[in-house]
Amino acid sequence: MAKVSKRVAANKAKIERTKFYPIDEALGLVKGCASAKFDESIDVAVQLGIDAKKSDQVVRGSVVLPAGTGKSVRVAVFAQGDKAEAAKAAGADIVGMEDLAEQVKAGNLNFDVVIASPDTMRIVGTLGQILGPRGLMPNPKVGTVTPDVAQAVKNAKAGQVQFRVDKAGIIHATIGRRSFEDAALKSNLAALLDALVKAKPATSKGVYLRKVAVSSTMGVGVRVDQATLAA
């Protein structure tokens, strides 16, 4: 373990906190600093040129990462009739109505994503205090309240990530795992940044994508030279 610690410490020492690195070098540094025995997530933080205190500048949405997230996702769906059958066929792990709501109320939250057909919101709406704080409440802005529950299930299973700007104007998201090839991580990052640009508020002025930094679950952040992202 001492050797690993020395290696990681040496890699961390290479990182200049104020320097902007080419994306390939940044990913190399991040992977080099990943010290955990598990396959750490590779995360990104994007500083946006918005005023997060203004309601018309809240950036929120979702995007399907082309290379996936490397994570197995369990999906629960509130639907009935044909939509319930379509959700099951698309790979949903749990499908129900009142019975699913009772499971949620009982604390059985064995899922990562909740999707709801619009006609079920009378039931789902009563679960806000349970699902909301956990980031599981379905919302049309991120595609989890939709008539096409089957497609929403497919998106979730394929590697869809949701994003929402925090109070500091920063978006945090996972773009893959340490085991991913750099090309996969770069394609996922490009897809995320493209989605953020499309979600840019009309009232946002000046530079929109101000800073981009990548890190591993247990590692330090490495700033990215955005000019190298299009390469």
From Swiss-Prot:
Ranges in a coiled coil: none
A single cellular component GO annotation: cytosolic large ribosomal subunit
GO molecular function list: rRNA binding; structural constituent of ribosome; tRNA binding
Keywords: Repressor, Ribonucleoprotein, Ribosomal protein, RNA-binding, rRNA-binding, Translation regulation, tRNA-binding
GO process terms (BP): regulation of translation; translation
CDD domains noted in UniProt: Ribosomal_L1 (cd00403)
Keyword DNA damage part of the UniProt annotation: no
Keyword rRNA-binding appears in the UniProt entry: yes
Similarity-based family: Belongs to the universal ribosomal protein uL1 family.
Description of how the protein assembles with itself and partners: Part of the 50S ribosomal subunit.
Job description of the protein: Binds directly to 23S rRNA. The L1 stalk is quite mobile in the ribosome, and is involved in E site tRNA release. Protein L1 is also a translational repressor protein, it controls the translation of the L11 operon by binding to its mRNA.
The protein, known as: Large ribosomal subunit protein uL1
Originating species: Cupriavidus taiwanensis (strain DSM 17343 / BCRC 17206 / CCUG 44338 / CIP 107171 / LMG 19424 / R1) (Ralstonia taiwanensis (strain LMG 19424))
